[in-house]
């Protein structure tokens, strides 16, 4: 049986979030939470929150045992970009693109 949790429109670059997602893919939930706790990245906080939401979904809606859960799949998709302008010399401006991410975590029992 599988359980999923999704966090959308997170203000972190998908490229940077995928680096942290690769750390927990395939791990037991308890190990993944420990890894994320000591990961000094902004995306680590977002993935930690999404993982805890998936665990709560498993406990409350499916009555699954938390000790047997592992991260079956985790992926980070690209969200919409915020477009901002930075003033430059001689009246010019350059575009700044601020990325956002959608994080999906799927847990399963071993």
Curated annotation (Swiss-Prot):
This protein's record includes keyword Oxidoreductase: no
Function: This protein binds specifically to 23S rRNA; its binding is stimulated by other ribosomal proteins, e.g. L4, L17, and L20. It is important during the early stages of 50S assembly. It makes multiple contacts with different domains of the 23S rRNA in the assembled 50S subunit and ribosome.
NCBIfam families tied to this protein: rplV_bact
Organism: Syntrophobacter fumaroxidans (strain DSM 10017 / MPOB)
Assigned GO CC terms: cytosolic large ribosomal subunit
Classification via Pfam families: Ribosomal_L22
Keywords, comma-separated and alphabetical: Ribonucleoprotein, Ribosomal protein, RNA-binding, rRNA-binding
A GO BP entry: translation
Protein name, as recorded: Large ribosomal subunit protein uL22
Similarity comment text for this entry: Belongs to the universal ribosomal protein uL22 family.
Keyword match Zinc-finger: no
InterPro entries in the record: Ribosomal_uL22 (IPR001063), Ribosomal_uL22_bac/chlpt-type (IPR005727), Ribosomal_uL22_bac/org-type (IPR047867), Ribosomal_uL22_CS (IPR018260), Ribosomal_uL22_sf (IPR036394)
SUPFAM superfamilies the record matches: Ribosomal protein L22 (SSF54843)
GO MF annotation list: rRNA binding; structural constituent of ribosome
Subunit text: Part of the 50S ribosomal subunit.
